Structures are given as structure tokens and as C-alpha cells.
A protein has these predicted regions:
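A conserved FAD-binding loop/helix module that cradles the flavin
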Residues: 129-150
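Short hydrophobic core segments
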Residues: 113-124, 147
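An anion/pyrophosphate-binding glycine-rich loop and adjacent beta-alpha core
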Residues: 146, 152-268
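Hydrophobic or amphipathic alpha-helical targeting/insertion segments
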Residues: 16-31, 143-157
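Glycine-rich active-site loop/strand segments that organize a redox cofactor
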Residues: 1-13
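Conserved redox-cofactor binding core of oxidoreductases
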Residues: 25-110, 122, 166-179
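General structural feature for long, well-ordered alpha-helical segments within catalytic domains
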Residues: 9, 16-20, 48, 59, ...
């Protein structure tokens, strides 16, 4: 975490990581495997070694499906009661402790209360506080702000994850972005034109990226960070892409995109 993360938490996560992977396998997550049957590894953004377990290009989705399947089994045996189509409205605080929530039934519109000995908020991020986001539309900060108003403390609210690989935005009215797998940076090379006039032609649709010769392409991540290349951490890749676009070297009709070239991976 570039020395920004809490070292004790990172150390603990590393300690239990093997057990977490084993649990995911037991839940049915179809991780990629080598020919001999052992789990395969690959390198992801921010890592120079192959230490990431993956499920082709759908790792996150398969992890969710595995968790949902395990939850469904507990619902089926009666150890968990699941309420769908509800949205948390507020946290109930008694003597300084969270003792329940107020939730809205999105079907009937009625408010309902749920008491508990402990409350776990597992609502994901709040990316839709920003105009452009790849998050689901429900990640809208309502749960986080409800907790904040009742006295919860944000560890680092500015540290919202910025993802460098998504399908570029088209036009001024689009706010929902489509996420692309992080593994794509492992196989591709990110570049923009070296000449600003080429970028302008690309934005106007006068030429295509394939028309630009190799010597006129700026593989800026490989140039700036030779040790990591295209596998720099997400925030570094995102900031670098924004800097190139702000400087006028962006592509697409909006000028707010960069190229991710897979020609070498395809030839392999």
C-alpha cells in the first residue's frame, strides 16, 4: 500500500490469505489451475511476481458467486434469514453502541426495524458519489453516511479506488462505466500517440490507432516506470492516463481514453 496501509492489518491479511483461498475453493470458486491440478498464479497490477489466484477474466464475479452460493446454503438450512429488496435507512444507537437498523422495504415502501446485538455494515464502496463510476448503482454512499451521522469514523474517505481499465466514456451524459478485467493490463501494453497532431486526428476519426507506426507510439508507463511497466498500481496507472489525456494526447472521440494493445499477446 505504498506505506499508507496499516502494517498490522496487512500482516494479518497475509497470514490468513491461504486459509481464505482454501475457503473460496471449498465454496466452489473455479480458480484457474495448472495442468497438474494445482492452483495457478499470475501477476496483477502493482505486483512484479506471479502471486495472484485468478478465475480467468472473471475473478471478482466468481468470488461473489461463491459467497452467494455459500450464503444460499445457510439460508436453505435455516441458519440465516435473508431479506431481499431492502435498503438501510439508519443505524439504531443505544448507549453508544449499534443495536440495529431501520430499513426500507423497496417493494411496499414501508419502514421496518431490526434489532441486533451487533451490526456489520458490508455495503461495499461509495463510488457513485462521483459522476463516473464502474460500481453498481446501489453503491451510493447512503449506508456509509448513515453510519457517519451516528458517530462512525472514516479511516480515509479520500482513498477511493480508481480503476484504470474500463470501457471509455462516450459523450457527456454517460455516468455508468463498464469495468474491464484487471488481468488485461497483464497481457496488454498501454500507449498514446507521441505526436499531438496524431491524437487530434484520432479524436476526429480521421485515422485509426493501427495507422500509427510503432516509432510514433508512446508506451508511457513502460517509459516512466521501467521496473513495473504496465503493471504499476492502479492509482499510478490512472493518474498517468489522466495526465496524458489532460496534456492533449488522449484518444477516442472524447480525448479521454488511451490504447491498450494486445497484439503481442495475440501473437504469442
Amino acid at each position: 500500500g505504498d506505506y499508507r496501509a496499516r502494517e498490522a492489518n496487512v500482516y494479518r491479511l497475509a497470514e490468513v490469505s491461504n486459509a481464505i483461498i482454501d475457503q473460496c475453493v471449498a465454496q466452489g470458486v473455479p480458480f484457474a489451475r495448472e495442468y497438474g491440478g494445482t492452483l495457478d498464479n499470475r501477476s496483477f497490477g502493482g505486483a512484479q511476481v506471479s502471486r495472484t489466484f485468478y478465475a480467468k477474466g472473471q475473478t471478482g464475479q466468481q468470488l461473489l458467486l461463491g459467497a452467494y452460493s455459500a450464503l444460499s446454503r445457510q439460508v436453505n438450512v435455516g441458519t440465516v434469514k435473508l431479506f431481499t429488496r431492502y435498503e438501510m435507512q439508519d443505524v439504531v444507537i443505544i448507549d453508544g453502541r449499534a443495536r440495529g437498523i431501520i430499513a426500507k422495504n423497496l417493494i411496499t415502501g414501508e419502514l421496518e426495524r431490526f434489532a441486533a446485538h451487533a451490526v456489520v455494515i458490508a455495503t461495499g464502496g461509495y463510488g457513485n458519489a462521483y459522476f463516473l463510476s464502474t460500481n453498481a448503482m446501489g453503491c451510493n454512499c447512503t449506508a456509509a453516511i448513515s453510519c457517519y451521522r451516528k458517530g462512525a469514523v472514516f479511516a480515509n474517505p479520500a482513498y477511493v479506488q480508481i480503476h484504470p481499465t474500463c470501457i471509455p466514456v462516450h459523450g457527456d451524459k454517460q455516468s455508468k462505466l463498464t469495468l474491464m478485467s484487471e488481468s488485461l493490463r497483464n497481457d496488454g501494453r498501454i500507449w498514446v500517440p507521441k505526436k499531438k497532431e496524431d491524437a487530434v486526428k484520432l479524436q476526429k476519426g480521421e485515422i485509426k490507432g493501427s495507422d500509427i507506426p510503432e516509432e510514433d507510439r508512446d508506451y508511457y508507463l513502460e517509459r516512466r516506470y521501467p521496473a513495473f511497466g504496465n503493471l504499476v498500481p492502479r492509482d499510478v496507472a490512472s493518474r498517468a492516463a489522466k495526465e496524458r489525456c489532460d496534456a492533449g494526447f488522449g484518444v477516442n472521440n472524447t480525448g479521454l481514453a488511451v490504447f491498450l494493445d494486445f497484439s503481442e499477446a495475440i501473437n504469442r
